[in-house]
Amino acid sequence: MTQQPLRGVTSLRFNQDQSCFCCAMETGVRIYNVEPLMEKGHLDHEQVGSMGLVEMLHRSNLLALVGGGSSPKFSEISVLIWDDAREGKDSKEKLVLEFTFTKPVLSVRMRHDKIVIVLKNRIYVYSFPDNPRKLFEFDTRDNPKGLCDLCPSLEKQLLVFPGHKCGSLQLVDLASTKPGTSSAPFTINAHQSDIACVSLNQPGTVVASASQKGTLIRLFDTQSKEKLVELRRGTDPATLYCINFSHDSSFLCASSDKGTVHIFALKDTRLNRRSALARVGKVGPMIGQYVDSQWSLASFTVPAESACICAFGRNTSKNVNSVIAICVDGTFHKYVFTPDGNCNREAFDVYLDICDDDDF
């Protein structure tokens, strides 16, 4: 997720299991552990310049870097792989790979054996990290946010991104698609307007998406392509910044420019709120769609002017779950919620004020 910088933050990303997050900044890069919140390391401006994008590979020593901001050292058309395990104090010695294109890189995704690089109208997939070679490239409709998601599971190599048709999703099984071919990916007609946010659950069995309208989140089975459930964020349009599943796919959270993080139940959807009209009986088709939607089980607010990413924390007990929100204004929010919809703040911090003297 990227936004105009507040306090120098240009983008934020969780790692693949949401146990860490990385922060691209005007002053370099910072890496944080989520629970407990602590800085794990940083790359300063002298080493990397101002950064536009950073992507982690789990909790490993590898980072993908894309230059950006007001004083970049690296180009916005290149992805550089930083290996902190490499000996040497010179930053050049730690830059072990470079992927260069003719247009700006909008996002990067990594898994243990592949790296995905997203441009405005094209997606590239390479083997990674040893002896990288291009495996696939896919043309897309205009994708200015660089939307895509990559399943981290060892069992499923699923890639999802906006399809050619407005509001559609394309799913590609990278394990069964032959490298060098342009076999047609599976398509899901998810929305009527352009896709604004997309996310896979950890095993890659469910994909969630929202359109630019931002009122509905729809979930689909990645195998059958059938719609599983429709979740209603609200009635007024909003820009969704982030959608994430809990580790066991029992819950889903979503953040938007309304300054609200919504939490939905997926395993037991009876926990979600329903429209009062649902008890009225038969209604017309347009109202019927509204009535059938499920509203969030719980929600909490963060500063509305500050974009944020959200994810689920570690469970503290069987009936208590938590959601973490990381905002570009430098704030960290942790809320706990129960199945009956109670939601309370458990922790607040300013992660930009947490410093560690060690480099990454």
Swiss-Prot record:
Keywords: Autophagy, Cytoplasm, Disease variant, Lipid-binding, Neurodegeneration, Repeat, WD repeat. Changing E55A: No effect on interaction with ATG2A. Changing A208D: In NBIA5; uncertain significance. Changing D113A: Loss of interaction with AMPK. No effect on interaction with ATG2A. GO terms for biological process: autophagosome assembly; autophagy; autophagy of mitochondrion; cellular response to starvation; glycophagy; nucleophagy; pexophagy; positive regulation of autophagosome assembly. Its main location: other. A motif (L/FRRG motif) lies at residues 231-234. SUPFAM superfamilies: WD40 repeat-like (SSF50978). It is found in: Preautophagosomal structure; Cytoplasm. Ubiquitously expressed, with high expression in skeletal muscle and heart. Weakly expressed in liver and placenta. Expression is down-regulated in pancreatic and in kidney tumors. One of its GO terms (cellular component) is cytosol. WD repeats lie at residues 1-34, 40-84, 92-128, 133-174, 183-222, 227-266, 284-329. GO terms for molecular function: phosphatidylinositol phosphate binding; phosphatidylinositol-3,5-bisphosphate binding; phosphatidylinositol-3-phosphate binding; protein kinase binding; protein-macromolecule adaptor activity. Interacts with WIPI1. Interacts with WIPI2. Interacts with ATG2A and ATG2B. Interacts with ULK1. May interact with the PRKAA1, PRKAA2, PRKAB1 and PRKAG1 subunits of the AMPK kinase. May interact with NUDC. PANTHER family: WD-REPEAT PROTEIN INTERACTING WITH PHOSPHOINOSIDES WIPI -RELATED. The L/FRRG motif is required for recruitment to PtdIns3P. This is WD repeat domain phosphoinositide-interacting protein 4. It comes from Homo sapiens. The gene is WDR45.
